[in-house]
Amino acid sequence: MTALGAATASSTEEISTGLNKFAAIAETVGLSYEYAASALATVTATTRQSADIVGTAFKTLFARIQDLELGKTLDDGTTLGKYSAALNTIGVNIKDDNDNLKEMDQILEEMAEKWQTLNKDEQTALAQTVAGTRQYTQLVALMENWDFMR
């Protein structure tokens, strides 16, 4: 984690604080610790938002997919069908061949592969569906800096 902090101008303490915000939920949706730490450091470094703010945004992002998997309709009216349809329009299927939700790191990886083929309006609409209107800018920052994250 020290190397990650040095590479992103974020302190180990800052990264740890941000990870504490969303690590438990990230694990439940299939995001590895390494992916979580790298995503947090990337967005913190590129936006200069605090790790606390970015960690909260990621917690919301991952809670959305978890709630949808449980069959809930989100406050903004998003359902699993709408979420899935938004990603399907760019060729990303959130379910595997057995109709189970894919791991979040795989969904993000597939989304990142398609991101640059979208225009800005499409990127914004997709990010708002996936992350919600209050937290979508952090997802945009992650997608825009995906090569740095990897």
Write out the residue ranges for each language-model feature.
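Amphipathic alpha-helical interface segments used for oligomerization, scaffolding
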Residues: 1-149
